[in-house]
Amino acid sequence: MANSTTVTEFILLGLSDACELQVLIFLGFLLTYFLILLGNFLIIFITLVDRRLYTPMYYFLRNFAMLEIWFTSVIFPKMLTNIITGHKTISLLGCFLQAFLYFFLGTTEFFLLAVMSFDRYVAICNPLRYATIMSKRVCVQLVFCSWMSGLLLIIVPSSIVFQQPFCGPNIINHFFCDNFPLMELICADTSLVEFLGFVIANFSLLGTLAVTATCYGHILYTILHIPSAKERKKAFSTCSSHIIVVSLFYGSCIFMYVRSGKNGQGEDHNKVVALLNTVVTPTLNPFIYTLRNKQVKQVFREHVSKFQKFSQT
């Protein structure tokens, strides 16, 4: 279908129309974005500078931190600009690009979370072969496959949406270009792209969740059969942070996207739930992974101590 689009820009309504709340919302999101960048860059820095953290687990964590930075940077800068300037518009191309990157990076995160759960499964359930199975080459291949899977799954439905005609209203009741609000503005039959979106959401979300759940089922079974209480606690502590992240991220996304149809989605509810996987979860992730990880905390304290000694000389 030829693109007979007449709309050149969209209006993002954001979270609230109340003028008195705009400054508060802006400051809140600005602080949140700063914390996300600080926390994830800190993870990247720590896992790069200390050779003790040159392990598959921290290699995957570093890649996940990079993904989180890009994922949130797709939304936050434009959202903050719209709030502070009062101009809530986004160009047609900008909206398509934002939607594509949001789903591409988000889908890649699902696959990377599944890879991280498999890494923990091998480490706990098959520790003697861990170094052999999770070699550097395998780790690089798993990360590459995660990126390629996200790209290949999203590029087809995104290109179909891009070719659709937008000739009617241009108001999106959201704070970014999400899939369902965008499809409501298409002036043509959207059954094909809806079906593709539903299938891809089920495959990427529920498929990777099945892998993650299976891995952690085996992990919990193995942990419960460890005779030493101290070793059980140590083994569980390496996985608990990942379980928390998975629960938050998957829970919000399944609520939003694993449903067929674009009608009756409850836009206001979707905006609130979208805050979980675009704002709350990325903010909590660095703190969950660092505050619950003794090795990361130890390395961080050592580097802070070195910096303090260096600054005092």
Swiss-Prot record:
Transmembrane annotation, as ranges: 25-45, 64-84, 96-116, 142-162, 192-212, 238-258, 271-291
Principal localisation: membrane
Positions bearing carbohydrate: N3
Family recorded in the similarity comment: Belongs to the G-protein coupled receptor 1 family.
PANTHER family: OLFACTORY RECEPTOR, OLFACTORY RECEPTOR 6E1
Gene3D superfamilies assigned: Rhodopsin 7-helix transmembrane proteins (1.20.1070.10)
Biological process according to GO: G protein-coupled receptor signaling pathway; sensory perception of smell
Cited function: Odorant receptor. Activated by (-)-citronellal and to a lesser extent by (+)-citronellal. Not activated by carvone or limonene.
Membrane topology: Multi-pass membrane protein
Pfam families per the UniProt record, alphabetical: 7tm_4
GO molecular function, one term: isoprenoid binding
Entry keyword set: Cell membrane, Disulfide bond, G-protein coupled receptor, Glycoprotein, Membrane, Olfaction, Receptor, Sensory transduction, Transducer, Transmembrane, Transmembrane helix
Subcellular location: Cell membrane
Keyword rRNA processing listed: no
Disulfide bond entries: C95-C177
GO cellular component, one term: membrane
Protein name: Olfactory receptor 6E1
